[in-house]
Each structure stands twice: as structure tokens, then as C-alpha cells.
Amino acid sequence: TVLNLDIVAKVVMKLLPEKGPYVLSMDRTNWKFGEENINALVIGITYKKVAFPILFKLLDKRGNSNCEERIEIMQRFIRLFGRESIACLVADREFIGEEWVKWLNDWCIEYHLRVKENFWVEDPRTGEEKRVKSMFIHLKDKQELVLHRIYRIKGQLCYLSGARLKNSDGVPELQILISFSRPDLALSRYKERWQIESCFRGMKSSGFNIEDTHLVHLERVEQLFGVMIISFTWAYLVGIKKDIEVKAIRILKTGNRAISVMKYGLEHIASVL
């Protein structure tokens, strides 16, 4: 029996603890078995420090996704749930390209995408070009700047905003974003992007251990992914309920939970099966 992945996405959407419109986070995850590379482009719906994976596309290649693949997965989301269900889309520096940003602009989809510091930006009023980094280089640590004029990057008109923030290694770096509209929201919205990485950790090592399956045939991996998406959502919802109604998850001195909500729910499900 072949699992219908559109139905999987609709089931997950029905199970979500909040109704839309939603902040979508697009990212890519990969794992390797010997010489085999499994590469997945994923759209997740962000919610309280996690992202629920809703759609994915397995890429039969190594490396980044291309514009066509990103457009295809977004078109699928719109076909299933409607454009009105999208509050905005956030994505990292990998997800930039003229054709891609043009498609988002044409569909009037609010987005907040990070760009590389060395990109050229043009002022459409004067034709002046400069590196986008030069517009934010003066920012001090934790300082933010929103530019309320429209600029052109990669041939497309957009708004710009930026901040100097510490990266995962604790080193301050510029975070520069392009937006379709509402640049004032860009930096706060973009903070939700990392929630999809929590989802990937749950899939890989913090719960489902997908890499231990050693599946390499894309058709089989695709079916497993579909089952795992439903299971991930179910485990998270059980974890929320148990945390609230049965026993709260212990909070560490750092302020973090001793165990993730998803893993808390997964362990409970495993104990009763």
C-alpha cells in the first residue's frame, strides 16, 4: 500500500494545535549512508520552539535545492491549503535566487529571507549599486536597522533589514534580510526559522533516529518520511497534554526543558504500546 502524502499533510494540518495563517519555515536536511546521499527539502509550520513538518520533497542529488524545486513545493502547499493560510515564509541564505524571489513577489507571499553579505543591492531611484553589507556594517552588537525604502536585489524589488547578532559559535555577525512587505516584522519573524532545526534533530537523533534505518531507496524513504511526519505531530501533541495535565517537564537551571516536548510524548506513546 502506498501512502498518499497529500493526505498525510492534510492530517497533520488538522492536528495542529493552532489555526492559521501560519509562519512557514523552509529548510533542507540530509543524511548519508556510505556513498548514498538522502536530501530532503522541507516546509515546516512553526509553533512554540518547534516546526511541524508539513510537506517535503526528496532531492535525488547532493547540495542545495534549486528555484524550480522550491516553487514546486510551495505550489503544492497552496494547492492543498490556499495562499491565505500563509502568514509568511522564512528561510536561510541558501534559499535565494532571482526566479524564486520573483515567484514569491508575483504571488504576493510575504517572506523574510536571509541574504549573503556580499550581494549587490541597487537603489532603483538612483541606479547606485553597493554591497548590501555596506548598508549595515556600522551596526553594533544586538543593534537592528530597518530600511523603509524599496531596493533591488537579484533583479527583484524588496525591503531590507538587518541586525548584528551572535551566531551559534557566539561570534557577532550581520544578519541581513529581504522582505516582500512589513520589514518591521522581518527580524522577529526570522527568529522562528531555527524551529525547523529542532524538528530535524527530533527526526535524526533526538527521538526517531531515522538515520538508523539505513534506507536509501527514495521511494521507501519517502514513505517512511510520511509516517514519521504524522508520528512526530502525534508525539508532540501527547507531550503537550502530558506536560500540562499529568506531570510537567522539569526545567533546568539554564531555563531549558530537561527533555523536548516531542520526546516526552514519544516516550509516553512507546510505554503504552
Regions found by a protein language model. Give the residues of each.
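Single, function-defining residue in the core of a domain
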Residues: 2-10, 17-22, 33-36, 47-273
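An active-site-proximal beta-strand-loop segment
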Residues: 27-40
